[in-house]
Curated annotation (Swiss-Prot):
The keyword Protease does not apply. This is Small ribosomal subunit biogenesis GTPase RsgA. The gene is rsgA. Its cofactor is Zn(2+). HAMAP family: GTPase_RsgA. Gene3D superfamilies: Nucleic acid-binding proteins, P-loop containing nucleotide triphosphate hydrolases, Probable gtpase engc, domain 3. Binds 1 zinc ion per subunit. It is found in: Cytoplasm. Its EC number is 3.6.1.-. It comes from Alkaliphilus metalliredigens (strain QYMF). It comes from the Bacteria. Belongs to the TRAFAC class YlqF/YawG GTPase family. RsgA subfamily. Residues 65-223 form the CP-type G domain. GO terms for biological process: ribosomal small subunit biogenesis.
Length: 292
């Protein structure tokens, strides 16, 4: 038996890399009995059934440290959330949705702001400052003149990384620059509606020369957070945490309660209004979904 990493799954076939060799595998019936479904990113134990043709069977799945639902990927170390600084303009509420979802999975986040060549650096300074103050690393990139690509490559080394973000922001183009040995399909950006066409067909791990892995995922127009309760949401806004301890009530959801540390910090300029606006929007989504 050999231990490998599942890098792709299509139509019941699982492609597992073992010592730089890729084996086409099927899952044994015991996995179904255990109600285990192999996921891209899983570490698995396989038996090689045909070395010449690189065929095998998956015997077992090792415990997962993380599991994303959308995209469905296991054992992710970090999420790089890619947004463009223009064309399309960054949607801060959507960005915050990505951040909250990553926080609920306890996965590290790096924010990548792409298409820097289309604006002046000082034009994005405020946006960068907002999220660096919250505590998220921010990388500025441009695939057209290689700005930030070396910094991005360093962040990827030795880790399994999900690239996420809305369509049209340049995820696949960035990856094509970082991974010259792989060509990912890119879509045209519709100038009429400033929203890219979905081009990624399936989830796949791509090997890095620096002993890491990346996943290119479909762009998202929304993220579902209805699994959270109203009183839980603020726990994942990491910039709220220092001020929430000053709330009178432990159950404070930072809306209309008296003596709310978060609202006080907001009025004092210690919290950013756009982040609180995102919080209010998400609270509204959770309340709406609870009614149905």
């Amino acid at each position: 038996m050999s231990k490998g990493k599942l890098i792709k799954g299509i139509a019941g076939f699982y492609y597992v890399e073992v010592n730089k060799e890729v084996y086409e595998c099927k899952g044994r019936g015991i996995l179904r009995k255990k109600k285990l479904t192999p996921l891209v990113g899983d570490y698995v134990e396989i038996t090689v059934t045909d070395e010449d043709n690189k065929k095998g069977m998956i015997d077992d799945i090792f415990p997962r440290k993380t599991e994303l639902i959308r995209p469905t990927v296991a054992n992710v170390d970090q999420v790089i959330v890619v947004f463009s600084v223009t064309q399309p303009d960054p949607h801060l509420s959507l960005l915050d949705h990505f951040l909250i979802l990553a926080e609920t999975q306890n996965i590290d986040v790096v924010i990548c702001l792409n298409k820097l060549d289309l604006v002046q650096r000082e034009d994005v300074a405020e946006l960068v400052g907002i999220y660096e103050k919250v505590g998220y690393p921010v990388i500025l990139t441009s695939q057209n003149d290689s700005i930030g690509l070396e910094q991005l490559e360093k962040v990827l080394r030795g880790k399994t990384t999900v690239f996420a973000g809305p369509s049209g922001v340049g995820k696949s183009t960035l990856l094509n620059r970082i991974l010259p040995h792989v060509t990912l399909q890119t879509g045209e950006l519709s100038s009429k509606i400033a929203r890219g066409k979905h081009t990624t067909r399936h989830v796949e791990l791509i090997s890095l020369e620096t002993e890491g892995w990346v996943v290119d995922t479909p762009g998202f127009s929304s993220l579902n957070i209805d699994f959270l309760k109203e009183e839980e949401l603020a726990d994942y806004f990491i910039d709220f945490e220092p001020f929430a301890k000053d709330c009178r009530f432990l159950s404070c959801v930072h809306l209309n309660e008296p003596i709310c540390g978060v609202k006080t910090a907001l009025k004092a300029g210690q919290l950013v209004q756009s982040r609180y606006n995102s919080y209010l929007q998400m609270i509204g989504e959770i309340k709406k979904n609870r009614r149905y």
